[in-house]
Design a protein with these regions (language model features):
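Residue-level signal for secondary-structure boundary sites
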Residues: 10, 92-94, 160
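Long internal repeat-built scaffold domains in very large eukaryotic proteins
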Residues: 12, 76, 171-175
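Structured alpha-helical bundle/scaffold domains in large eukaryotic membrane-trafficking regulators
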Residues: 13-18
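Secreted peptidase-domain scaffold signal
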Residues: 19-110
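Exposed aromatic-hydrophobic patches
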Residues: 65-71, 127-142
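Surface-exposed beta-strand/loop patches in noncatalytic accessory domains
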Residues: 93-135
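C-terminal edge strands of extracellular/lumenal beta-sandwich accessory domains
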Residues: 101-113, 140-209
Length: 209
């Protein structure tokens, strides 16, 4: 989750004289998901919030996760980034060239984040393995209401073989939102508070029901 291309996209795109519209497609096989940044591992930051989830999913099922949008990012024309990483335990088929037995992938809903775009690995290529890692970032102001979220939809489908009915595929999901320290130092606190309120409302609803 702490991997990125850094300055390689700009530098290699220039050095290799790649067409602007082809840079990501040409560099993805070469760079993959980029270089791991050890400084981001095991350390918290007030301008970044990380959420970890996971579970088991069956064919044609969808699981939706909602990462609260921090109000301190609203209507600010400043750099912001969403990073989403999905890994799953795919059953394998050794007798076929297309050995991945199932496909689990995520899509995201751009509530208030239409100004942020995928910036690194090519979106079709990232779905070819069992690890999908995408960075969505931008600098234009986001417009959203209190309580809005960055929604991530995890889905499952057949690939090289037909999954048996109710056959479960295990997966793990990590999502984060961040901005520069000079823009906001309350991202972590805002997301934590929103998640706590959501959990409290969920419990209250179950008790009343």
């Amino acid at each position: 989750h702490a991997s990125s291309w850094g300055e390689w996209k700009k530098d290699l795109g220039k050095d290799l004289d790649l067409p602007k519209g082809q840079i990501r497609k040409q560099l993805t096989p070469l760079l993959g998901y980029g270089c791991l940044d050890p400084s981001r591992l095991g350390f918290s930051a007030r301008n970044r919030a990380v959420v970890i989830a996971g579970g088991s999913i069956t064919k044609d099922q969808r699981h939706t996760y909602s990462l609260p949008l921090p109000l301190s990012l609203r209507s600010k024309a400043e750099w912001h980034r969403f990073t989403v990483t999905l890994a799953f335990a795919a059953p394998t088929v050794g007798t076929l060239n297309q050995y991945r037995g199932s496909k689990v992938y995520f899509e995201y809903k751009e509530d208030g984040t239409k100004t942020a775009k995928r910036s690194e690995a090519e979106p079709n290529m990232v779905k070819k393995g069992s690890l999908q890692h995408e960075i969505i970032e931008g600098t234009r102001a986001m417009t959203f209401a209190e309580g809005d979220a960055f929604s991530i939809h995890v889905e499952c489908m057949d690939d090289a073989q037909h999954l048996r009915k109710k056959e479960e595929i295990k997966y793990a999901l990590v999502a984060s939102v961040e901005t520069a320290e000079q823009t906001s130092t309350t991202i972590y606190d805002e997301v934590r508070m929103a998640l706590r309120m959501r959990a409290r409302d969920h419990v209250r609803g179950r008790v009343q029901g």
